[in-house]
Amino acid sequence: MQQFDFDLFVIGAGSGGARAARVAAKHGARVGIAEGANFGGTCVNRGCVPKKLMVYASRIPDAIKSGKAFGWDAPAARFDWNALMSHKDTEIDRLESVYERNLLGAGVQTFPEHATLLDANTVRLRNSGQVVTAQRILIATGAAPARPDFPGVELAITSDELFHLPEQPKRLLIVGGGYIAVEFAGVFAGLGSQVTQLVRGPALLRGFDDEIAETLREHLSMRGVDLVFEDRIELLQREGAALRVTTTGGRSFEVDTVLLSTGRLPNIEGLGLEAAGVEVNDKGAIVVGPGGRTTVVSIFAIGDVTDRLNLTPVAIREGQAFSDRHYGGIESPEIDYALVPTAVFTTPEIGVVGMTESQAREHYPRLRVLKTRFRSMAQAFAGSQDQVFFKVLVDDATDRVVGVHLLGEGVAEMIQFIAVALKANATWLDFRSTVALHPTIAEELVTLK
């Protein structure tokens, strides 16, 4: 029987890879993990965590403004970009050290360098040149921001660089209409920047419910975001300290910073996939079957590098299930990707689970659509023009709720528990027979008619 250095070797110590490594080690496996950038991966260092901290910061002006209606006479506030960035960096450093400490505490051997596959069971560490073998190899290298091709694209930045800008851009162009793009549009508008958003298509948030996307468009416009649809950059040039943007639609204007938010691509460069025989699709994503198995029997992949559903909790669940199955003898049910809750941290934020209305109409001929639009008690009292929008989709034949789409303050917290109800095949009768909690915006969900 062949002897290996490790039972499992993980490439990538982001949320999914780190979870898989720790769980396997706790089950008694000999585990190694390589990370060429930062422990914690995109989410901790260049994604979810720093972005959410900036979302919190961007909402402070609203709280100050509405405070007057509640009797608070707040003095004029001044935003300090460097203070936020410094505090953010301290928190990210803390979380990264927690990730590495937890891996070491579980008995995982860490290698702070990139790794390349040599064959089905062998990995070479790029900096040191060390070669290690493993019975199984798990690829969890995530994804990276895509960069569209146009003259001057090198003058633009992605979300990777955004979190390290030395100054707040006073004039910001965001290219893209997906959830990351609209989140940053809301953040920088809230922080006082002049924001223009350039969207290639006719609407925001492709893949989300049409009414949710349109309602968000209204709110972003109301908050001062200049939304430009069906246009793209033709040329980007440096003009002194500014950038000159020329679009295919004939627009020309100056900004301080151009942020590219046009999607993400699987991180496969330098992995040696071809040498190992691992198949990728036309988008560069690793092709996997049940349990994350690739076309090579000893090599597996989880998370964004597989381009199935690119969310941190999905990668974590996939990593947990992988190690439980192979090293703990525990069979976890396959993830139901159709019922994964999703949040968009705009202001107001979005929470969705299940089918969109257009998707539901393809599956359910008798679809009941319940929706409401209102201002919350706090919004009305403070004179805010923000609104709450709820939409529930019900299959009339079975009374089962097949989709819930929410926009409003705090709905990301709500959608987590609504997802539990949909996972349990809750009916609309289950929802409306539940006594409402008053006064909340959530009560409107169970009193919809």
PLM regions and their residue ranges:
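A Rossmann-like FAD-binding core segment of flavoenzymes
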Residues: 109-112, 116-125, 132, 191-290, ...
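Rossmann-like dinucleotide-binding cores of NAD(P)H-dependent redox enzymes
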Residues: 90-96, 100, 163-164, 169-173, ...
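Beta1/beta-strand and adjacent pyrophosphate-binding region of the FAD-binding site
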Residues: 2-14, 168-178
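Flexible, glycine-rich terminal cap/loop adjacent to redox cofactors
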Residues: 11-16, 20-37, 42, 49, ...
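FAD-site-proximal beta/loop scaffold in flavoenzymes
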Residues: 154-170, 252-331
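Short beta-strand "acidic-cap" motif of Rossmann-like dinucleotide-binding folds
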Residues: 29-35, 139, 193-199
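N-terminal Rossmann-like dinucleotide/flavin-binding domain of flavoprotein oxidoreductases
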Residues: 1-4, 23, 43-46, 50-131, ...
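Glycine-rich dinucleotide-binding loop and its adjacent helix/turn
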Residues: 48, 139-194, 227, 274-276, ...
